[in-house]
From Swiss-Prot:
Transmembrane segments: none annotated. This is Transposase for transposon Tn1721. It comes from the Bacteria. InterPro entries: DUF4158, Tn3-like_transpos, Tn3_Tnp_DDE_dom. Keywords: DNA recombination, DNA-binding, Transposable element, Transposition. It comes from Escherichia coli. Residues 678-697 are annotated as: Disordered. GO terms for molecular function: DNA binding; transposase activity. Required for transposition of transposon Tn1721. The keyword Transmembrane does not apply. Belongs to the transposase 7 family.
């Protein structure tokens, strides 16, 4: 059986692709004086040009010119220009094969190159094995191999040799990974791992299948079941630190492979691979279960507290009429008493003139019942659901292993007290139980004259545990999401080395004194400028008075002439089925090749099957209904393909392919240069089985839902999407989309609405090199912060909220740099850190320092906003693109009433990724045909004003059929370079 190739044909072409852009040609193919002197020794244009081209190829990519080599025209033109030869002479070069070979030999001597021999292969494999222990991506390994060989200056071998070296390196790395996971295991460990492949008692599924099931709902019953899963994993008792020295990418991939395989398939593996795979599954699944347990506990508490608050409000509303009646009655009585005092008459008679004395006495008793204590709130109602918590919290506290920072030691001590009480079946809280963690609003309920109230002591401790887990003051052993704060950051030694070498990956001056001096000087200048403009009433389209700030709304940005062009071009776009559109776009871009097999990296063999699975995600139809709507497909086929070919990383790579094509398309330049972007959240209601996984945000009503948070470039390409809880502020995820997309976009300026900004985001955006420009609602209520106090800027008094605490920034400067560097290098995601900062119940030093830094940037931005109408227009236009994209997404995601009905978070992510990929495909297809439509208008004698092209949008879908049977007609495929005919005006 022949060895499976690591590299696909497309990847081979990519690796040896020649530079074509002007920048790359200058970088790789610019001759020095010595080169030109050697080249000029050739006689005739053909020989000079051919010799020079061979010199270029031997330098980069590093291979010799073949007899059948086809070179891009830009290469020939660039080389010919430098050697002053006619480009047409290239066709004559090499008519004598001897000449070509003689030139190649002379150049090898000149460049001091040697051919790559078989004796060089072992060293290359050893070098690649180190990288293969981090990733088994063939393209990355081959790219590293070529780069390494270029530095050593041999002539590159055939790619089949590179492929062989990569394959051997992956095999060696796999054996090392297996060995690292299996050697520490005892016979007892292996026996327990084998047990996981057996049927669970009284069930038709194996232990491993049951253990990997996600909890269905946030309630005590499913919580207890999930706790049992964690206990089962803990019984396996893998050696401490197992897998710690294996790169997380490889460990996660091995665990995913094991998770997708049937127990029968796993049982067929040779022992070392089987035990290594099972160990990886147990390690990853244990961390997942711990994270899910903490999340479930959080959601149950949030649900109980929300229910108590709602009940409290309902009770208050019911009593509102009675309270109002009493207030009106006592107002009349009070007025009668005032009049009686003035007249000197009997006050008791005055009361009885308003209400009989017996009724007055009764009303006083009723008022006492209606009255509430001074600190009255909904907390006392939470106690009504104490039984719900008691069903699972003893077991939860038993299986979790929390650790605490000094600030949360009191909470940890309270948790330990609860564990001891549960173990000893104590009903009363010990008198010496820790109480320092109890907040003032809890004290009246917890600390009573009879002692510590058991019910409210436990609820308070569990609530504070939830808060401390969110902020990171408490972490859990074995968790991924709830780790020690310091573990998320770059190691202190590595950060110190980067700073010492001036290699921090940040966009600012790392010297705190110089940085702060520059920013504060700029802030002073901007404050002075805006003060002068405001005082002279010269702020553009804005007025600042003692009563506040007023900004004139922007006028319509689309002229009537542009609307006429929009209508004309939209009528010309060909009508097309969504299936044919996806096939067209895949023919242009090859995005489907990125959906590689999880195990061997092979491309999907059946393109229509793959596109059906993607479309099933995008239109919210699901695999079952998709199989019914697509002739020749079955659920089993689609399910298998999704399990092995569709993952977050394959969706991300395919999306990057589409975004890059949009970025490079000439017509897209009319909308922007790819350096600005916007982001916005789009809520989808959670229904059916997905309802229990949804979150509630009062902003969207009382129904649960999910938010798809999407970033879109100024060229309309949606380059990132995330599924997030509707209860989390949009600003948490703004940076993730900018930092972790895989496209070639280089975003410099980013726009959001009000929900997309916080001071922490302003700070991190600036540190990481992005200009942040949110459209802030009620801007006059968003305060400025100044260096010298409000008295220095009397004109701006209505806008000033306080003085900057620069001392705090200086004190935590290194912590700020370390945090930002960690986010930039991917050690931790920005969203995780921002969630933790948003959860701090106290004034954490780093959080406060970052906030102060953000206040500087926010103040500078607002001052810029007040001075620049152009900035306001730019932000407004960018956000409008995102809102228009949301309309397209809503139209595509039409099945199941547009509701999220998938129970697992993984499936919900696939829905969002599929939707984003298909909308990106629609954008690219529309861009191509909008260009053809404008060309068609010109050819028809209807000139198009180039200034109006910026107002066209590739987000229309009226011409796209999204419904019906999903038939993939290979016969409708267009030939290379061919396009569908435009519609004739006036025809459907």
């Amino acid at each position: 059986m022949p060895r499976r190739l690591i590299l696909s044909a497309t990847e081979r072409d990519t690796l040896l692709a020649l530079p074509e852009s002007q920048d790359d040609l200058i970088r790789y193919y610019t001759f020095n004086d010595s080169d030109l002197s050697l080249i000029r020794q050739r006689r005739g244009d053909a020989n000079r040009l051919g010799f020079a081209v061979q010199l270029c190829l031997l330098r980069y990519p590093g291979y010799a010119l073949g007899t059948d080599s086809e070179l891009p025209e830009p290469v020939i033109l660039w080389v010919a220009k430098q050697v002053q030869a006619e480009p047409a002479s290239w066709a004559k070069y090499g008519e004598r094969d001897v000449t070509r070979r003689e030139h190649a030999q002379e150049l090898r001597t000149y460049l001091q190159l040697a051919p790559f021999g078989l004796s060089d292969l072992p060293a290359l494999v050893r070098e690649l094995t180190e990288l293969a222990q981090q990733t088994d991506n063939g393209l990355l390994l081959a790219g590293q191999a070529l780069e390494s060989l270029r530095q050593k200056r041999p002539i590159l071998p055939a790619l089949s040799v590179i492929d062989r070296a990569c394959s051997e390196a992956i095999a060696r790395a796999n054996r090392r990974v297996y060995r690292a996971l299996v050697e520490p295991l005892t016979d007892s460990h292996r026996a327990k791992l084998d047990e996981l492949l057996k049927l669970k008692a009284g069930s038709s599924i194996t232990w491993l299948t049951w253990l990997r099931q996600a909890p269905l709902k946030p309630n005590s019953r499913h919580m207890l079941e999930h706790i049992e899963r964690l206990k089962t994993f803990q019984l396996v008792d893998l050696p401490e630190g197992l897998g710690r020295h294996i790169h997380q990418n490889r460990l996660l991939k091995l665990a995913r492979e094991g998770g997708q395989m049937t127990p029968k398939d796993l049982g067929k593996f040779e022992p070392q691979r089987r035990y290594a795979t099972l160990a990886a599954v147990v390690l990853e699944s244990t961390a997942t279960v711990i994270d899910e347990l903490v999340d479930l506990h959080d959601r149950i508490l949030v649900k109980l507290f929300s229910g108590a608050k709602h009940k409290h409000q309902q009770q208050f509303q019911k009593q509102g009429k009675a309270m109002n009646d009493k207030v009106r009655l006592y107002s009349r009585i009070g007025q009668a008493l005032l009049e009686a005092k003035e007249s000197g008459s009997d006050p008791y008679a005055a009361i009885e003139a308003v209400i009989p004395w017996d009724e007055f006495t009764e009303s006083v008793s009723e008022a006492e019942l209606l009255a509430r204590p001074e600190g009255f709130d909904h907390l006392h109602l939470v106690g009504e659901n104490f039984a719900t918590l008691r069903r699972y919290t003893p077991a939860l506290l038993e299986v979790l292993e929390p650790r605490a920072a000094p600030a949360a030691q009191g909470v940890l001590a309270a948790v330990q007290t609860l564990r001891e009480m549960n173990a000893d079946n104590l009903r009363k809280v010990p008198a010496d139980a820790p109480t320092a963690f109890i907040k003032p609003r809890w004290k009246p309920l917890v600390i009573t004259p009879e002692g510590l109230d058991r019910k409210f002591y436990e609820i308070c401790a569990l609530s504070e545990l939830k808060n401390a887990l969110r902020s990171g003051d408490i972490w859990v052993k074995g968790s991924r999401q709830f780790r020690d704060f310091d573990d998320y950051l770059l190691p202190a030694e590595k950060f110190a080395a980067l700073k010492r070498e001036q290699a921090l990956p940040l966009a600012i001056n790392p010297n705190s004194d110089q940085y702060l001096e520059e920013r504060l000087q700029l802030l002073d200048e901007q404050l002075a400028t805006v003060t002068r403009l405001a005082k002279d009433n010269e702020l553009p389209d804005a007025i600042l008075t003692e009563s506040g700030l007023k900004i004139t709304p922007l006028d319509a940005a689309v002229p009537d002439r542009a609307q006429a062009l929009i209508d004309q071009t939209s009528q010309l776009l060909p009508r097309i089925k969504i299936t044919e559109l996806l096939m067209d776009v895949d023919d242009w871009t090859g995005f489907s090749r990125h959906f590689t097999h999880l195990k061997d990296g092979a491309e999907a063999k059946d393109r229509t099957l793959l596109l059906s699975a993607i479309l099933g995600d995008a239109i919210n139809l699901g695999l079952t209904k998709m199989a019914e709507s697509s002739p020749g497909l079955t659920y089993a086929k689609l399910s298998w393909l999704q399990a092995w070919h569709i993952r977050d990383e394959t969706y991300s790579a395919a999306l990057a392919e589409l975004v890059n094509h949009q970025y490079r398309h000439a017509f897209a330049a009319h909308w922007g240069d790819g350096t600005t972007s916007s982001s916005d959240g789009q809520r989808f209601r959670a229904g059916g089985r997905g309802e229990s996984t949804g979150h509630v945000n009062p902003k969207y009503g009382s129904e649960p839902g999910r938010l798809f948070y999407t970033h879109i470039s100024d060229q309309y390409a949606p380059f990132s999407t995330r599924v997030v809880n509707v209860g989390v502020r949009d600003s948490t995820y703004v940076l993730d989309g900018l930092l972790y997309h895989e496209s070639d976009l280089r975003i410099e300026e980013h726009y959001t609405d009000t929900a997309g900004f916080t001071d922490h985001v302003f700070a991190l955006m600036h540190l990481l090199g992005f200009r942040f420009a949110p459209r802030i609602r009620d801007l006059g209520e968003t305060k400025l912060y100044v260096p010298q106090g409000v008295q220095a800027y009397p004109t701006l008094r209505p806008l000033i909220g306080g003085t900057l605490n620069i001392k705090h920034v200086r004190a935590h400067w290194d912590d700020i740099l370390r945090l930002a560097s960690s986010i930039k290098q991917g050690t931790v995601t920005a969203s995780l850190m921002l969630r933790k900062f948003g959860s701090y119940p106290r004034q954490n030093g780093l959080a406060v320092a970052l906030r102060e830094l953000g206040r500087i940037e926010r103040t500078l931005f607002i001052l810029d906003w007040l001075q620049s109408v152009e900035l306001r227009r730019r932000v407004h236009a960018g956000l409008n693109k995102g809102e228009a994209r949301n309309s397209l997404a809503r139209a595509v995601f039409f099945n199941r009433l547009g509701e999220i009905r998938d129970r697992s978070f993984e499936q919900q992510r696939y829905r969002a990724s599929g939707l984003n990929l298909v909308t990106a495909a629609i954008v690219l297809w529309n861009t191509v045909y909008l260009e053809r439509a404008t060309q068609g208008l010109v050819e028809a004698g209807k000139p198009v004003d180039g200034e109006l092209l910026q107002f066209l949008s590739p987000l229309g879908w009226e011409h796209i059929n999204l419904t019906g049977d999903y038939v993939w007609r290979q016969s409708r495929r267009l030939e290379d370079g061919k396009f569908r005919p435009l519609r004739m005006p006036g025809k459907p």
